[in-house]
Curated annotation (Swiss-Prot):
Family affiliation: Belongs to the LeuD family. LeuD type 1 subfamily.
GO BP: L-leucine biosynthetic process
EC code: 4.2.1.33
Function of the molecule: Catalyzes the isomerization between 2-isopropylmalate and 3-isopropylmalate, via the formation of 2-isopropylmaleate.
Gene Ontology MF term list: 3-isopropylmalate dehydratase activity
InterPro entries (alphabetical): 3-IsopropMal_deHydase_ssu, Aconitase/3IPM_dehydase_swvl, AconitaseA/IPMdHydase_ssu_swvl, IPMI_Swivel, LeuD
Name of the gene this protein is made from: leuD
Cited PANTHER family: 3-ISOPROPYLMALATE DEHYDRATASE SMALL SUBUNIT, 3-ISOPROPYLMALATE DEHYDRATASE SMALL SUBUNIT 2-RELATED-RELATED
Species of origin: Shewanella denitrificans (strain OS217 / ATCC BAA-1090 / DSM 15013)
Record-given protein name: 3-isopropylmalate dehydratase small subunit
Coiled coil (UniProt feature): none
Keywords: Amino-acid biosynthesis, Branched-chain amino acid biosynthesis, Leucine biosynthesis, Lyase
Pathway given in the UniProt record: Amino-acid biosynthesis; L-leucine biosynthesis; L-leucine from 3-methyl-2-oxobutanoate: step 2/4
Catalytic activity: (2R,3S)-3-isopropylmalate = (2S)-2-isopropylmalate
Length: 201
């Protein structure tokens, strides 16, 4: 998993609340169990006018040329609600997004995002709205996110602090998923296993 320390990138706003996992990646695209190839289906029902995904919806922000290459997504509260599917952060990451900023996230999505190297940042409603206004008002507006300093910097230079539990921050800074984090305790695990009584082994 790619480590995350700081990132500056083009930001795009989807000014909607309660964006659920079925909107992020519809259920008909969940048959794969590998993480790649989901980006093309991200927000499928909003991005395309047809079921085959051959007719882009020109009104949807991710299809607009000014947001091509966006790596930071801004959204409203309760992002990632709905059914638990790890494919949702897979699709966001495969599309090229590194950060999602919103006033709140569904708990399961929040954990899945961190476990897959996608940084979910919680800011206040007013701060998210300011970011959206700046991004929508300036062509090519970039937002910076510093995980070491726990700061978001808006296109105008406004700084917004955010918090993240230290265990999640450690995982992202070091590029560790759940398996990778477990492997960092390899010596302790081996020492424990070496002391297990034979009758329990």
């Amino acid at each position: 998993m790619q480590a995350f320390t700081a990132h500056s990138g083009l930001a795009v706003a989807i000014d909607s609340a309660n964006i659920d996992t079925d909107q992020i990646i519809p259920k008909q695209f969940l048959s794969k169990v590998t993480r790649d190839g989901f980006g093309v289906h991200l927000f499928h029902d909003w991005r395309y006018l047809d079921d085959a995904g051959e007719k882009p919806n020109p009104e949807f922000v991710l299809n607009q040329s000014r947001y091509k290459g966006a790596s930071i997504l801004l959204a409203q509260e309760n992002f990632g609600c709905g059914s638990s599917r790890e494919h949702a952060p897979w699709a966001l990451a495969d599309f090229g997004l590194r950060v999602v900023i919103a006033p709140s996230f569904a708990d399961i999505f929040y954990g899945n995002a961190i476990n897959n190297g996608l940084l979910p940042v919680v800011l206040t409603q007013a701060q998210v709205q300011q970011l959206m206004d700046e991004v929508q008002g300036e062509l090519g507006a970039q937002v910076s996110v510093d995980l070491q300093l726990l700061r978001v910097i808006s296109p105008s230079g406004a700084e917004f602090p955010f918090s993240l539990v230290e265990s999640a921050r450690h995982k992202l800074l070091n590029g560790l998923d759940a398996v990778g984090e477990t492997l960092t305790h390899g010596q302790a695990i081996s020492a424990y296993e070496a002391n297990i009584p034979a009758w329990l082994a």
